[in-house]
Amino acid sequence: MRAAYIAKYDEPYALGERPIPEIRPDEILVRVHAAGFCHSDLQVLQNKFTKPTPIGLIPSHEIAGVVVDVGKNCDDRLRLGDRVGMLNFKHACGVCAGCRASQARGNTRDPRFCEAREIAGFYHDGGFAEYVAADPTTTLKLPESVGLNQAAPLMCAGATVWGSLERVTAGLREGDTVAIVGIGGLGHLGLQFAKAKGFKTVAIDNREAGRQLVAEMHSAALKPDLIVDSSDTAMASRNILEFTRDEGVAAAIVCTSSIEANRWALTLLRIRGCLGVLGIPPSAWHFDSSPIAFRELSIMGSYVCGAESAGRMLDVVAKWNIKSQLTILPFERIPDIVRTYEDSAFQGRIVVQLLDEV
């Protein structure tokens, strides 16, 4: 099969041939139609994580395709010909501390916190190939109205911001105000998700490109209620307070690694507001604990969501026709993908299309 792989750190991906994966009895084989590229993929290529990136790794953890083989120990939840999206965590062991903690809360096995998990596109082969082995417990059947190209970024970007949104808005009511700080691929989806869930939304970015991205939202029903230029944070704060009648926002999700953006977003919260942290700053950031104590604020981290939560996300995507702005590249352009991603004019998400939509 055709595959792209890491031949050298921080160098363009190489293209070549690899054997089609042999699936285990508890796995399915997916014919990849679309696979996304995000900042984590760049970090993998640059060997930036604590655990070294394996040379020869097939990258991409945002994968959508069609089931072409099912292991003999799999149930019938997924069948041949099903269109699916694949979350990148695979094969929870069920016995480690992370698995025990998940199951103690009443959840099914959740490989996100499993100490022995496999991670597609990070340390195990991912989606920049014609076929990939998938874990059926973290692979989701797609609604008919969700195309494979659109599904790919939902499997990481979508699942990440959706998971944060579900957590920071727990207990909120429709009509409460949610702010999204940083309007790239995650922020663009997060605003649509929040609007679909009935919240008023504030889109915040110091870049004209980010503000333009949401101003040109494909659906009027999903456009933010307020778009704010945060290059002048004092003016931006006044605009947001005026919009919320001096209360502040009920929740804010920060989709940027900027330390100043995280600090400032905390000041936007109303009493008992919640800050969702998604961007990872390059160094530790410090905050004033006084307003956290006296206004009873919360700061909440969020990993990419699990399969049950992702299923709810897909239902909302289908109902509201939520879409990413995509730059679609053919397989042969994969060696140029980093240059495309780092172009200052780039907006939205990159998807490599290996096969036509079905």
Regions found by a protein language model. Name each.
Residues 274-276, 287-327:
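Rossmann-fold dehydrogenase core element
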Residues 187-188:
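N-terminal Rossmann-fold NAD(P) dinucleotide-binding loop
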Residues 90-181, 216-217:
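NAD(P)H dinucleotide-binding glycine-rich loop of Rossmann-like/cofactor-binding domains
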Residues 83, 177, 273-274, 298:
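Short glycine-centered segments of the SAM/dcSAM-binding site in methyltransferase folds
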Residues 196, 234, 239, 263, ...:
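C-terminal hydrophobic helical "lid"/dimerization subdomain
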Residues 21-35, 48-100, 143-145:
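Glycine-rich beta-strand-centered segment in the early N-terminal region that forms part
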Residues 173, 269-270:
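Helix-to-beta-strand junctions that scaffold the AdoMet/dcAdoMet cofactor pocket
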Residues 174-183, 195-261:
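Adenosine-nucleotide cofactor-binding segment
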